[in-house]
Regions:
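Structural motif
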Residues: 64-74
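Conserved short "hinge" loops at termini or chain/domain junctions
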Residues: 1-66, 126-132
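Short loop/turn elements at secondary-structure junctions
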Residues: 77-132
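Non-catalytic, well-ordered alpha-helical scaffold segments
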Residues: 47, 73-77
Length: 132
């Protein structure tokens, strides 16, 4: 059995002062992650996720508790998707390929939740499509 050392709960300062901060405990409570990644990596992924989400909600004023919850949810799921991308690996065996495919499906599911949460936050419809 592998036991992870507890990760201290540090709050990650949002680069955008008008938007809420997100802590490591927020991330671990919101999405299914283990603590084996460590405080430094989790903090970095939260910060990268904040940058990604902040770019998508420019000029949006986040005031209410509902908006704060939705913002934190978007950041946490984006951070989880970034971690999932880092863990994506392929090898030449059948098991490695199926693990990689499962990770891709998980990553797409996490990003879908992010997109739905941002749509809810910005009062847009969820069924957006990208034109090629």
């Amino acid at each position: 059995m592998l036991l992870n050392a507890p990760v201290t709960d540090s709050e990650v300062q949002n680069p955008e002062p008008d938007y809420p901060n997100v802590s490591i405990n927020d991330l671990l409570a919101m999405v299914r992650l283990d603590q084996s990644k460590g405080e430094v990596l989790l903090t970095e992924k939260i910060l990268l996720a904040m940058d990604n989400i902040n770019d998508q909600v420019l000029l949006l004023k986040i005031d209410t508790e509902t908006q704060i919850r939705k913002y934190k949810r978007a950041v946490c799921y984006e951070a989880a998707a970034l971690i999932c991308e880092d863990n994506l690996d392929f090898d030449t065996t059948t098991n490695g390929q199926s693990r990689g495919e499962n990770q891709q499906a998980k990553m797409q599911s996490l990003r879908r939740i992010v997109n739905h949460t941002i749509a809810d936050l910005t009062n847009r419809k969820r069924n957006r499509v990208k034109l090629i």
